[in-house]
Amino acid sequence: MDSSSSSNYFSVGSTNPSAVVLLYSKELKKWDEFEDILEERRHVSDLKFAMKCYTPLVYKGITPCKPSDIKNSVLNSEEIHYVIKQLSMESLQSVDVLREEVCEILDEMSHKLRLGAIRFFAFALSKIFKQIFSKVCVNEEGIQKLQRAIQEHPVVLLPSHRSYIDFLMLSFLLYNYDLPVPVIAAGMDFLGMKMIGELLRMSGAFFMRRTFGGNKLYWAVFSEYVKTMLRNGYAPVEFFLEGTRSRSAKTLTPKFGLLSIVMEPFFKREVFDTYLVPISISYDKILEETLYAYELLGVPKPKESTTGLLKARRILSENFGSIYVYFGDPVSLRSLASGRMSRSPYNLVPRYIPQKQSEDMHAFVTEVAYKMQLLQIENLVLSPWPLIVAVLLQNRPSMDFDALLEKTLWLKGLTQAFGGFLIWPDNEPAEEVVQHHILLHSNIASLVKDQVILKLESGDSEVVDGLIFQHITLLTCSTYRNQLLNIFVRPSLVAVALQMTPGFRKEDVYSAFRFLRDVFSDEFIFFPGNTVKDFEEGCYLLCKSETIQMTTRDILVTEKGNAVLEFLIGLFRPFVECYKLLCIYLLKEEEEHFTEKQYLAAVRKFTSQLLNQGASQCYDVLSSDVQKNALAAFVRLGVVEKKKVNNDYIFSVNEPATTKLEEMLGCKIPIGKPATAKL
């Protein structure tokens, strides 16, 4: 049930008006223990590790085959024969020409998984990881559950995506634990890397185009290729729900294409079940942090190349702290579909005939994608640094070390109360922990004479590679702060809603919360139609931390709650400020129509001027990630209209709706009870 008809959720009675009234309760999750796999690697020869006896446990229903057999199976499948026949009639191309095209697509796409390549990467990655990471921590209980799952049913691995390292990390870990290495969906960009592209292909990568452009034959070949590997139980299939690396450390909204494909064999009764395994990969320090800041500031992403990889060797002399890889419980697709989706519609048509996805099926795929992402988020590890940097950003440019330590420890308690997966070495003095993480991130902050100072200048020059150094540092800091928002977003939205609501009537606060959740649903992961539960979770966490009390009618702020609310509002304020500034830009936009590229360039110029003039201190607005998310939200809210013209999308501003949104975000007009999606 969605939130729009939920007034009865807030009418739970109590004779005592000061009593806390909540329908939501949440037990604190207990996570598995971590083991550092590098500890053993440091005492055993890398060559011995790479050449070890490797006999992985496999799926009980496996059909043994070579990579070339999979290609032949796809080429000769009923589905591809049917699609070729249909396209031949539509395009008047001969069947032989189309069949030749299928062979070319398969040659471009398919992996050539070989044990020799796996052993090479095991040797190389073991050396590299020991050089740049203190630890690579894995929950071995999760590995044991995965081991059982792989033998029972086809498995799909769904890791979070923050770094290029993610790509081969799971292959390295599964090889380490004698599990079958996965076949991995990779972008075509990697094929441009001489030798490396082929090495990746031999380590299990299969390549997909970023866009299929309505190419029916390509889609048919790609989906049949993935389904063939899944049906045969050839190897676990791995792909990233986010589709690309998150440059901002916030989980990106999911892509649904590959998830739809891997679900199909179950719905067509070709497999009894399929396990989906959410995997959370967390970094103390992200290898590409500076590169990401450049990209967010508008510098084009460097093309993947072998030369670029060789230039990146300098990172081998740096310390990136620890990596944490948490394997979540395998989730049965059969259980998810039980009572929710019927498989009978698939019985009405022969399996080889492609079917258009029904609305019900699309809704189900969407729900599963968001569920998997929320499970990933739940198991993402927070190191002390995101807490430290969140405090620093609210007290920039510098802070007394003792004050920073005190505030960070206060935030540590709040993070744990909110159920955050915080790894904090309690056996070490707190000041040493904070000092260690400042040193680890010495490119961003430094400790000078009891003052912790953000590095906002670069020697004699304020400009580096055409970018203002201060902007690079602050966007890098924002990336780490964003890790906190994964668990703080719901209580933060309640805090901002309280600030926006004159009087603290529960239903008015809820209306403001619903409005904010709707506006920012491209920035954060919310389960579709779960607004009430999200509101209750936010309120529950604020009650649990003794920030608020709830009566049947009102939300009351406690005496100690003001400090928590002030911090949460400060944590979320950059996003509200960004969207307000982008509304102001749109109202000044002189062009009647514009493309996304024109919008990004003009917004960058407009916001840079505001910051240079001191008219705003909101550096997050420089992020192309925020700018793109805001544009998507504005289209969804009817603030901007989007049309397709000559294979490109053009946008135009709805001025009254934009003005209204800007005023609502700035609390100039009340939200009102019917906070509908369209403004």
From Swiss-Prot:
Domain writeup: The HXXXXD motif is essential for acyltransferase activity and may constitute the binding site for the phosphate moiety of the glycerol-3-phosphate.
Membrane protein topology class: Peripheral membrane protein
Protein name: Dihydroxyacetone phosphate acyltransferase
Motif HXXXXD motif positions after renumbering to this chain: 161-166
Pfam families, alphabetized: Acyltransferase, GPAT_C
UniProt source species: Oryctolagus cuniculus (Rabbit)
N6-acetyllysine PTM positions: 642
Residues with the Phosphoserine modification: 11
